[in-house]
């Protein structure tokens, strides 16, 4: 689950694999760490992507001063967190990729991940939306109480599109786990993922596998695309598997030549019978012959000229049908505005300060007194905690001094 979550945020087909894969490992490591710590400290309710983002920004950009063999060294705070974890920790293993990287390579990994998850720091609406949970995915499969979850994704804010793909991925995985509790590993109620503008959604991890095995668990996908090129662009080689595992094809209209050719081919051919005649130009026809040939049921060029309100459906193991449909706006169904729907979202009033994980508890364990080989006692504290610095300075005996460093303050006293 955590691996697929990391894939949603870091997948990038345009860059070299090392950067998204390294960024994914770093993100997975931080998620696993905060989950483990949240469980141990009783703060699981505060584990969210907003907390992950703040953990990364705060600890990834600050250094602490450590004494190693009598020498002061700047050590990244994020490195210190994972170094302190016990051997065999899943979070520590996932962090190894970025731990091994140095210099510009390490900076590029950190920059890549910072860009991938920046939405949780720059978009307060998303931070609040993901700060808690009001949805029990298992209720979607309750045959006695039908339920639908409607996602409203603003087309003008592409940065928010990743949330829709993330929701679909997590919902699918949760329902698969729930299906395993039933005989035959099949949900008691069908669940449809109706994904409008599927071609514009951020890639959903393992989509080809989901659509292949999902039907056996009563998990069905309805994918709406403008043309098949969108599918090929997004999913590359997996696009063919996705297409071939759709049991129903519904064609409304397209001007894309390749899409029309594919659909015309999927509809199949029809057989026509015709007669040919031969003979001299100025005499009676002396020969005639009958023959048969196959032609497309509907030619690609005819598909693009279908009248408005017409649709062609090809169902698996059935002959295609030509039908008509009524546009939604003619059905007289009242639609709610986004503002009306938002009134039911309790999380929009959440204070982010109350939902963030208590990161100070992590800082307190990182900065501990250290004694060097000359007897000097050191204690590092963050510069943004002036009250703590003053308190520690007053606690030390006469002659203690404070050295101000770029990131933190190092307090030391003579032996």
For each of these PLM feature ranges, what is it?
Residues 211-312:
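Conserved ATP-driven motor cores of ASCE-family P-loop NTPases powering translocation/secretion/packaging/pilus
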Residues 412-415:
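Conserved small/polar residues in nucleotide/adenosyl-binding loops
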Residues 1-219, 234, 244, 301-322, ...:
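P-loop NTPase motor domains
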């Amino acid at each position: 689950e955590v691996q697929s979550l990391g894939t949603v945020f870091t997948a990038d087909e345009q860059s070299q694999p090392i950067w998204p894969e390294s960024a994914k490992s770093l993100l997975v490591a931080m998620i696993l760490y905060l989950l483990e710590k949240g469980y141990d400290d009783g703060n699981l309710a505060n584990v969210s992507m907003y907390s992950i983002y703040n953990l990364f920004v705060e600890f990834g950009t600050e250094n602490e001063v450590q004494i190693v063999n009598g020498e002061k060294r700047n050590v990244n705070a994020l490195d210190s967190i994972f170094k302190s974890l016990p051997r065999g920790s899943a979070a520590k293993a996932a962090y190894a990729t970025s731990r091994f990287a140095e210099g510009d390579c390490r900076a590029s990994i950190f920059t890549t991940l910072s860009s991938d998850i920046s939405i949780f720091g720059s978009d307060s609406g998303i931070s609040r939306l993901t700060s808690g949970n009001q949805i029990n995915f298992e209720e979607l499969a309750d045959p006695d109480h039908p339920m639908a979850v409607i996602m409203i994704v603003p087309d003008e804010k592409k940065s928010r599109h990743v949330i829709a793909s993330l929701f679909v991925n997590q919902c699918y995985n949760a329902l698969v786990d729930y299906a395993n509790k039933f005989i035959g590993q099949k949900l008691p109620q069908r669940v449809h993922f109706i994904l409008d503008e599927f071609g514009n959604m951020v890639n959903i991890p393992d989509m080809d596998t989901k659509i292949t095995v999902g039907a056996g668990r009563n998990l069905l996908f309805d994918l709406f695309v403008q043309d098949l090129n969108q599918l090929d662009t997004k999913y590359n080689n997996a696009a063919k598997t996705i297409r071939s595992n759709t049991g129903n094809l519904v064609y409304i209209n397209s001007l894309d030549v390749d899409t029309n050719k594919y659909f015309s081919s999927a509809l199949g051919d029809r057989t026509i019978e015709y007669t040919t005649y031969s003979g001299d130009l100025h005499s009676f026809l002396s020969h005639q012959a009958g023959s048969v040939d196959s032609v497309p049921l509907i030619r690609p060029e005819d598909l693009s000229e279908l009248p408005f309100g017409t649709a062609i459906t090809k169902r698996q193991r059935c002959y295609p049908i030509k039908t008509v449909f009524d546009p939604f706006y003619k059905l007289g169904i009242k639609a709610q505005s986004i503002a009306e729907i938002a009134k039911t979202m309790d999380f929009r009033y959440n204070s982010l300060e109350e939902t963030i994980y208590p990161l100070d508890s992590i800082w307190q364990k990182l900065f501990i007194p250290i004694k060097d080989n000359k007897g000097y006692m050191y204690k590092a504290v963050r510069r943004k905690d002036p009250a703590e610095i003053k308190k520690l300075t007053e606690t030390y005996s006469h002659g203690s001094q404070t050295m101000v460093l770029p990131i933190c303050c190092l307090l030391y006293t003579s032996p």
